[in-house]
Design a protein with these regions (language model features):
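Hydrophobic h-region of N-terminal signal peptides that target proteins for export
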Residues: 3-13
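Short beta-strand-initiation
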Residues: 3, 43-45, 143, 153-155, ...
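Extracellular or lumenal secretory-pathway regions
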Residues: 13-133, 137-138, 144-147, 199-283
Length: 283
């Protein structure tokens, strides 16, 4: 049974609260080029979901949300331990760690058009999580003449600069929601595809359906430290560039030595311009 099939079973045991309902659900494939520890540059793909109505939206990784939901209660944690116990013999036998239930993406983006605010929750590194709010961006779009079809919808090309990257997107006026993946929004139609110039990041819609699914808030909000956007990005970058050293120090602390014996001087790293979705934190 997959993680996503288990989610309704878990949620059915919880007391229902009244949350706003979406009108549309869009699945996106997020392709990312990233720096993986000392291994250098790698690529990966994650599924993200956009739930949206005319006033608010939520962009999130569904598998990660399911695991966050389990981690938010004692019974959920016990259920996760059972799932882990069930796969560990096969993991030990084959060395296939992909069998271990793990998060696929971390960022949650909530847009509230009524209040003109965006709320972002993200993983920083190790046991650190951060969140921030900012005004809903008034992106300056340049709409072009090029067209193409995505998922059967006629789309128009548009471009914008946002927080250090230049984006080319395709939106469809056939779905008049000023929404899109991640923070991208503000066009007279739903954004179904977005790619930034370097090719390090892209979002491509893979499915779309009408829904009345609830837009539920994030699980365990208290674990997210409030901070400014650029501070969060700088801390993510520090963790990325010093991952091995931070892990070794944490290992020392777990052992109780606190000596820092496993800490190392930073290695000479591969020079690369691979970076996050937003790069203006470096200024």
């Amino acid at each position: 049974m997959t993680l996503l099939l288990l989610l309704p079973l878990y949620l059915s045991g919880k007391k229902k609260e009244a949350y706003p309902k979406a009108e549309i659900m869009v699945s996106y494939n997020y392709h990312e080029t990233f720096v993986r520890g000392s291994d250098g540059v790698a690529e990966r793909d994650y599924e993200f979901i956009l739930l949206s109505n005319t006033e608010q939206s939520k962009f999130y990784p569904p598998i990660s949300e399911y695991l966050d939901s389990l981690d938010s209660t004692p019974s959920g944690k016990a259920q996760y331990e059972q799932m882990l116990s069930a796969v560990m013999p096969e993991v030990v036998r084959t060395g296939n760690y992909s069998l271990v239930p793990s998060k696929k993406g971390h960022v949650y983006v909530f847009k509230n058009r009524k209040e003109s605010v965006v709320s972002v929750y993200d993983f920083i590194g190790l046991t650190e999580f951060g969140c921030y709010t900012e005004p809903l961006a008034e992106m300056q779009w340049e709409i072009g003449d090029s067209t193409k079809t995505i998922l059967g919808y006629d789309c128009i090309m548009a471009r914008t600069n946002y927080h250090g990257r230049h984006w080319t997107v395709w939106f469809t006026p056939e779905i008049p929601l000023q929404e899109g993946p991640w923070k991208l929004c503000g066009l007279p139609g739903l954004i179904l595809e977005a790619t930034e110039t370097s090719g390090q990041h892209s979002f491509v819609a893979t499915g779309l359906e009408i829904t009345d699914k609830e837009i539920v808030p994030i699980y365990s909000p208290s674990k997210y430290e409030k901070m400014e956007r650029k501070e969060l990005l700088r801390r993510q970058r520090y963790n990325r560039d010093n991952q091995e050293n931070i892990t070794n120090v944490a290992y020392d602390n777990i052992l109780g030595s606190g000596s820092g014996a496993n800490a190392r001087m930073p290695k000479e790293r591969l020079v690369t311009d691979v970076d996050f979705l937003e790069t203006d934190y470096r200024k």
